[in-house]
């Protein structure tokens, strides 16, 4: 089992709805450009039936060096998070139980 790539998504659009390869690639790239720019502007991206992407701030917290056991601070940072929607969770769970 491999990974699904942007090229795979574009190829799926070619096969399923008959877009040209160039149009499919442009559509996939355009979609990700919109998601990326929305997150850069700190807008939440809500994809109905799929899930939500959002930018969050993580505050500094204590950590530990696993080799030495020495306590080290983990610096504050900005992260992108994804929360799957209930429909996506249910479909994946149903598939995994088959």
Curated annotation (Swiss-Prot):
UniProt GO MF annotations: DNA binding; structural constituent of chromatin
GO cellular component, one term: cytosol
Gene3D superfamilies cross-referenced by the UniProt entry: IHF-like DNA-binding proteins
Swiss-Prot/TrEMBL keywords: DNA recombination, DNA-binding, Transcription, Transcription regulation, Translation regulation
CDD domains listed in its UniProt record: IHF_A
One Pfam family here: Bac_DNA_binding
Superkingdom of source: Bacteria
Signal sequence range: none
GO terms, biological process: DNA recombination; positive regulation of metabolic process; regulation of DNA-templated transcription; regulation of translation
Keyword Transmembrane: no
Keyword Transcription applies: yes
UniProt subunit comment: Heterodimer of an alpha and a beta chain.
Function: This protein is one of the two subunits of integration host factor, a specific DNA-binding protein that functions in genetic recombination as well as in transcriptional and translational control.
Protein family membership: Belongs to the bacterial histone-like protein family.
Protein name according to UniProt: Integration host factor subunit alpha
